[in-house]
UniProtKB/Swiss-Prot annotation:
Organism from which the protein derives: Infectious salmon anemia virus (isolate Atlantic salmon/Norway/810/9/99) (ISAV)
UniProt keyword list: Host cytoplasm, Host-virus interaction
Subcellular location: Host cytoplasm
GO annotation, cellular component aspect: host cell cytoplasm
Origin organism lineage: Viruses, Riboviria, Orthornavirae, Negarnaviricota, Polyploviricotina
Name of the protein described by the UniProt record: Nuclear export protein
Entry function: May mediate the nuclear export of encapsidated genomic RNAs (ribonucleoproteins, RNPs). Interaction of viral NEP with M1-Hsc70 is thought to promote nuclear export of the viral encapsidated genomes.
Subunit description: Interacts with host HSC70.
Amino acid sequence: MNLLLLLQVASFLSDSKVPGEDGTSSTSGMLDLLRDQVDSLSINDSTTEPKTRLDPGLYPWLKWTETAYRSSTRSLASTIVMGALVQQRGSGNGITMRELELSLGLDFTSECDWLKTCYVNKNFVFLSEKEIAVNMEVEKFICNEN
């Protein structure tokens, strides 16, 4: 993976306006579509229940992230994880990689190569939904390069 690209993305997200703030672009439609797609999935396999759960009140995005992973829609959930890769935010809303793994009942080190690199940064903070939408495009670029 191109480390320079990741540094550029981190710089862009930390210094730039959130898309839509200036009225020139908006990612809300894309996020609504993504959320609708994930919310429409049904999970009936009770054997996939995680042993540990995070408080969904603290992490409102958890429900549809978890649903995406449970239904094997890896690309949907991985775009959200990509949003966490960029940098740790000091907001106090952090979640460790291990906490997310336990909640979803997964081992991220078994995922695709770029997601394995995310495991190196075990303490991170998920970005806002609009920032995640920006990262969706970055994730597509990285996965296509590898």
